[in-house]
Amino acid sequence: MLSRSLLCLALAWVARVGADAPEEEDNVLVLKKSNFAEALAAHNYLLVEFYAPWCGHCKALAPEYAKAAAKLKAEGSEIRLAKVDATEESDLAQQYGVRGYPTIKFFKNGDTASPKEYTAGREADDIVNWLKKRTGPAATTLSDTAAAETLIDSSEVAVIGFFKDVESDSAKQFLLAAEAVDDIPFGITSNSGVFSKYQLDKDGVVLFKKFDEGRNNFEGEVTKEKLLDFIKHNQLPLVIEFTEQTAPKIFGGEIKTHILLFLPKSVSDYDGKLGNFKKAAEGFKGKILFIFIDSDHTDNQRILEFFGLKKEECPAVRLITLEEEMTKYKPESDELTAEKITEFCHRFLEGKIKPHLMSQELPEDWDKQPVKVLVGKNFEEVAFDEKKNVFVEFYAPWCGHCKQLAPIWDKLGETYKDHENIIIAKMDSTANEVEAVKVHSFPTLKFFPATADRTVIDYNGERTLDGFKKFLESGGQDGAGDDDDVDLEEALEPDMEEDDDQKAVKDEL
């Protein structure tokens, strides 16, 4: 009787464990609150993606994430990849501070207190390389040519240090550089056969890549800083296509000056124009990042809007700086020859190009409604009128937060339409830019009081009719603060806006 009871108990336990055991989809563990702790206990290294089924970024990531999972599994790695539907598992999402989709966190040895945020690229190689850096040595020891070949073949970019004495000062500097780079595999070797295969007869560092010239040999004194600079200059293609997968490399890189070629892949002289762009890029490695954008692709239409371009105006070139202040520049010539692009880049670096400020034409009825319409051409005259207090919403037509605000802003306009010195206005910041105001987020609300000193006050109070009225009646004091909402860098990323009914969570990279 006892043995039968024990058997039933054991079977019940097995059934319960089986019910909670994570399922797999394309080699990715599917986790829920009921099996999350079990998965952490079973796997020392676990990368978890918190996603939403409707999220465009998550859909784009899915095949690369699965490819990375399959690659690690095939290698017999301890590392596993998992995913959590955060819209279903809200408790887990809240526990791990999920604010946007996808959010990806790395759990090591079951530590739930401080999982590492995944910040590298969205391609399978990026994911695998980042994980291997987190779980193994900074550089793999390459004992023979087969090991070197495997490392080079494993990724789009790989770096190998050739040192006859791997304990030398130069080798130590190389390892420090390897520790500082997340998304590129590093190898180190003292094997004479490996030296011979890659045509080295003395110590050196080589960056191998599956594009452009194929390899770059480091020259000069081997220091961590110089190696990192060398890698920065050579790890990306001369021209990189802007996609969902490459966006993190573009925005996450150290080069903050980007020149963009908007070119439809369907155009007859596509190869020639891209070739001219690539030829110009050769002279600006490490200084300006050359980016190609397929202007026909649906996901890229918002980027065209951001630069004030229409599909029929492409091919076209624009330059942007992503420092503290985002600034755009337009070539004086529409010619897309290598010579003209090179000249434009040189003139920019020499400080001889003025920023390009977009403006729509002024509508005839711009001041006929309670909310006045501002464009670049009339902004200065209206906003800095010394006799008027002007409250302006800087918006983007596609922004969900702006759409929510619209009816409230219209009511505010109605409230003050007959006021003698308060003006409520709005400006589409995707089509209009002004030198006096840098818009970093949507919507941005700024107050221009009736003074002669061109004062500008940020509003960051409640976005309610009462909140706005208190702010205006207090002379711009009650609710003043820094602007904070959808970052403009997101506007440059493809497929940023999801359906309106998904407005509860910001879609972040």
Swiss-Prot record:
Residues 1-19 form the signal peptide. Keywords: Acetylation, Cell membrane, Chaperone, Disulfide bond, Endoplasmic reticulum, Isomerase, Membrane, Phosphoprotein, Redox-active center, Repeat, Signal. Gene3D superfamilies: Glutaredoxin (3.40.30.10). The record marks R463 as: Lowers pKa of C-terminal Cys of second active site. Disulfide bonds join C55-C58, C399-C402. The record marks R122 as: Lowers pKa of C-terminal Cys of first active site. It is found in: Endoplasmic reticulum; Endoplasmic reticulum lumen; Melanosome; Cell membrane. Phosphorylation of Ser-359 by FAM20C is induced by endoplasmic reticulum stress and results in a functional switch from oxidoreductase to molecular chaperone. It also promotes interaction with ERN1. Residues 20-136, 335-477 form the Thioredoxin domain. The modification N6-succinyllysine is found at K224, K273. SUPFAM superfamilies: Thioredoxin-like (SSF52833). It comes from the Eukaryota. The record marks G56, H57, G400, H401 as: Contributes to redox potential value. One of its GO terms (molecular function) is protein disulfide isomerase activity. Residues 480-501 have a biased composition (Acidic residues). Pfam families: Thioredoxin, Thioredoxin_6. GO terms for biological process: protein folding; response to endoplasmic reticulum stress. Heterodimer; heterodimerizes with the protein microsomal triglyceride transfer MTTP. Homodimer. Homodimer. Monomers and homotetramers may also occur. Interacts with P4HA2, forming a heterotetramer consisting of 2 alpha subunits (P4HA2) and 2 beta (P4HB), where P4HB plays the role of a structural subunit; this tetramer catalyzes the formation of 4-hydroxyproline in collagen. Also constitutes the structural subunit of the microsomal triacylglycerol transfer protein MTTP in mammalian cells. Stabilizes both enzymes and retain them in the ER without contributing to the catalytic activity. This multifunctional protein catalyzes the formation, breakage and rearrangement of disulfide bonds. At the cell surface, seems to act as a reductase that cleaves disulfide bonds of proteins attached to the cell. May therefore cause structural modifications of exofacial proteins. Inside the cell, seems to form/rearrange disulfide bonds of nascent proteins. At high concentrations and following phosphorylation by FAM20C, functions as a chaperone that inhibits aggregation of misfolded proteins. At low concentrations, facilitates aggregation (anti-chaperone activity). This is Protein disulfide-isomerase.
